């Protein structure tokens, strides 16, 4: 039986507050009337509170797109237009192209690694140095213990990012330098012992993909993931023709102490990846760099759910592989951890409700010290707020720094996408709570 978590009073009030009904179906048919007005209220209130300039929400359920709506602005008034001069605001549209930031990890890199796993070219518990010898050129005993599994689950001991203090890659992109720095950064903790979300892990996985395939990651992902799924507007290095529809992020502020070392200093990033490491590497890296639309991310999500459910699907991995990829895979994972986490959430909701703010009642993770992570997919960690209150532990998702998120629940055959360029609004607070609120409202609207 699917686990259901008791919902706080605030959620019930949120849903009851609106009588408007919205139903969208890509097949052009109407499903049972479903109240999605609370999602619009959440998004519009967040925009009014200057938490983000705008965004696009897509909800899939039962094999259909049941909600697809754009909100707010794609570009704020007074920010640089396509000609680099201050320009009027641009409305957000459903077909806006976003820098999806770390959603690159599951949509491109981890999927590619698991394809290589299916082909017998990668073993999950093989040391990284077997594929990338320069990872351990000095034959260090600790580095020898780092495996592909540890990179995929952020348990390698690597620090969060490479050193960006000097201006490497600013005047001219230098991917080789970025990979070299990732290969040689000292470990911050013992391999397999600590969950630390680190971009270095996926920079290394990107390098592994390129070495084993002989292709750049953008070429590989386009041919083997995006094209088979029909994701025609998803790619690294977006074409110039897409730029008018791309949501700008922030101005390039790298080398602020000496702007003369960065020829793009002060330029609004639009069609150029925001992540500074990926940008210095030329826009193609394992941890960030992909641009996409909410529609295309929905194609990926629906194909994934279809494959897991053993329905006809073009998803480029086998069902068994996906089942592994989307379940706890961190070193030391064991049966029963997901069930224990859901039990803990039920008990917390029943015995220690947060009466000041019911939306914050759950703990993330549900059990302190038990962080559950699949291969690129968050299951129950400190980053799991986009799950909301109703989807159980065992559902999974991912987020991107620019303001993007995707959460999927195979148990209810549902996915929730929120794509935004939150960082375009300078100084705006994180939108972690908004992501969770939207997921909760979506699940409640679907009567899950």
Can you describe what each PLM-predicted range is?
Residues 289, 395, 402-415:
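Short, surface-exposed beta-strand/loop micro-motifs that present aromatic residues
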Residues 422-434:
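A short acidic/glycine-rich loop-to-helix N-cap element
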Residues 37-44, 57, 63, 99-125, ...:
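Active-site SXXK
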Residues 32-98, 121-123, 138, 180, ...:
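Short, conserved catalytic-motif segment at the N-terminal edge
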Residues 12-30:
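Bacterial Sec-dependent signal peptides at the C-terminal "C-region" and cleavage site
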Residues 75, 139-393:
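Short, surface-exposed loop or secondary-structure junction motifs
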Residues 124-139, 227-229:
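Short, glycine/proline-biased beta-turn/loop segments that scaffold the active-site neighborhood
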Residues 1-4:
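Positively charged n-region of N-terminal signal peptides that target proteins for export
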């Amino acid at each position: 039986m699917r686990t259901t978590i008791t919902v706080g009073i605030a959620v019930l009030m949120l849903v009851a507050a609106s009588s408007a009904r919205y139903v969208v179906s890509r097949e052009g048919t109407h499903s049972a009337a479903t109240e999605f007005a609370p999602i619009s209220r959440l998004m519009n209130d967040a925009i009014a509170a200057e938490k983000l300039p705008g965004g696009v929400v897509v909800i899939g359920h039962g094999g259909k797109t049941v909600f697809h709506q754009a909100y707010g602005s794609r570009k704020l008034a007074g920010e640089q237009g396509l000609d680099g001069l201050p320009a009027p605001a641009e409305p957000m549209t459903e077909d806006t192209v976003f820098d999806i930031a770390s959603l690159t990890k599951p949509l491109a890199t981890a999927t590619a690694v698991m394809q290589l796993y299916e082909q017998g070219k990668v073993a999950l518990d093989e040391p990284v140095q077997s594929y990338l010898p320069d990872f351990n050129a000095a034959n260090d005993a600790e580095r020898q213990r780092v495996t592909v599994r540890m990179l995929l689950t952020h348990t390698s001991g690597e620090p969060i990012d490479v050193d960006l203090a000097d201006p490497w890659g600013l005047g001219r992109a230098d991917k080789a330098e970025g990979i070299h720095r990732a290969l040689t950064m000292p470990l911050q903790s013992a391999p397999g012992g600590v969950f630390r979300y680190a971009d270095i892990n996926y920079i290394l996985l990107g390098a592994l993909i390129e070495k084993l395939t002989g292709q750049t990651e953008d070429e590989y992902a386009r041919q083997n993931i995006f094209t088979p799924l029909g994701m025609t507007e998803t790619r690294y290095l977006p074409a110039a023709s897409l730029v008018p529809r791309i949501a700008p992020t922030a101005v390039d502020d790298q080398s602020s102490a000496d702007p003369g070392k960065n020829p793009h200093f002060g330029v609004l990033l639009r069609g150029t990846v925001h992540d500074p490491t990926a940008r210095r590497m030329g826009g193609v890296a394992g941890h960030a760099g992909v641009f996409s639309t909410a529609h295309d991310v929905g194609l990926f999500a629906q194909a994934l759910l279809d494959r897991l459910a053993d329905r006809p699907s073009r998803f480029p991995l086998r069902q068994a592989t996906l089942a592994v990829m989307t379940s706890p895979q961190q070193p030391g994972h064991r049966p029963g951890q997901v069930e224990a986490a859901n039990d803990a959430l039920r008990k917390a909701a029943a015995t220690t409700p947060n009466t000041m703010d019911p939306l914050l009642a759950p703990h993330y993770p549900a059990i302190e010290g038990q962080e559950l992570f699949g291969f690129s997919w968050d299951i129950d960690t400190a980053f799991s707020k986009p799950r909301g209150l109703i989807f159980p532990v065992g559902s999974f998702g991912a987020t991107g720094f620019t303001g993007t998120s995707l959460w999927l629940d195979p148990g209810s055959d549902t996915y929730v996408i929120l794509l935004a360029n939150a960082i375009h609004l300078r100084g705006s607070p994180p939108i972690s709570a908004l992501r969770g609120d939207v997921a909760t409202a979506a699940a409640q609207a679907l009567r899950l």
